[in-house]
Amino acid sequence: MSMSDTLGDMLTRIRNGQSANKAVVEAPASRFRGNVLDVLKREGYIRNFSKFEKRPGIHEFKIELKYFEGKPVISEIKRLSTPGRRVYSSIKNLQKTYNGLGISILSTPRGVMSDNEARAAHVGGEVLCQVF
């Protein structure tokens, strides 16, 4: 049976890995999930990620989680737009996450970006998740 929400699965793996104080978690690879991980890395929520071949033709990401003074950098990671309920926002209606302390990750016509980058580029789109 195929998985319906692959991004939600990856975010849950990150959340569970940080709850268990893991240094590294693995998640199935795709270009879209790689773009989301790139935003998380740029914003400083994960240390790094790399793609590797688990079996011939099967690629996965190795995600290095980030901690500060023994505590996870990500306090909360929440999926907003799901396959059953899409959430879209124009740039005017895009709310700041936790008064600007967190970020929202958006899928826009110009690619996957954080809410700050979307405001600078003046584009709205699908609100994928919030990270705090």
Which functions belong to the PLM regions below?
Residues 1-132:
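Core subunits and conserved enzymes of cellular information-processing
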